[in-house]
């Protein structure tokens, strides 16, 4: 999947990897995906199942994130009437289903934003 709700994912994946693990240099789990995150993805996924070890595989991790975002950005859309942005997705990744509205994820977003093209939103 190259985009999600019109949001290009490749630049966001790159930025998240930099913030979470210095692009894999400081952790085997590039995106710092937790067991709870994997369990949640397996619960909401219709036809895919992931193992905890799959967190160490970059492409499988990215697929888990896509599933997670597809599910939880719908809540964002329903509550705000707006399409998600890089900020929305990054904050959901960091703060869980309602991470987009948690104050504590704003600092995380500022760090991610620095690694995006032009340091800008979507």
Annotate each predicted stretch with a short phrase:
Residues 5-9, 24-31, 54-62, 79-86, ...:
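Solvent-exposed, acidic/flexible segments
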Residues 40, 44-100, 113-117:
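Alpha-helical segment that forms one wall of the substrate-binding/catalytic cleft
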Residues 1-11, 117-122:
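N-terminal secretory targeting signals
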């Amino acid at each position: 999947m190259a985009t999600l709700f019109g949001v290009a994912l490749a630049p966001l994946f790159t930025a998240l990897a930099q913030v979470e693990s210095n692009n894999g240099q400081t952790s085997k789990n590039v995106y710092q995906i937790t067991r709870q995150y994997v369990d949640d993805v397996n619960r909401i996924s219709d036809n895919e199942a992931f193992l905890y070890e799959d967190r160490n595989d970059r492409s499988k991790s990215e697929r888990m994130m896509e599933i997670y975002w597809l599910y939880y950005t719908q809540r964002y859309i329903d509550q705000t009437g707006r399409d998600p942005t890089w900020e929305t997705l990054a904050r959901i990744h960091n703060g869980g289903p309602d991470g987009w509205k948690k104050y504590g994820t704003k600092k995380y977003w500022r760090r991610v934003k620095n690694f995006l093209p032009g340091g800008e939103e979507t």
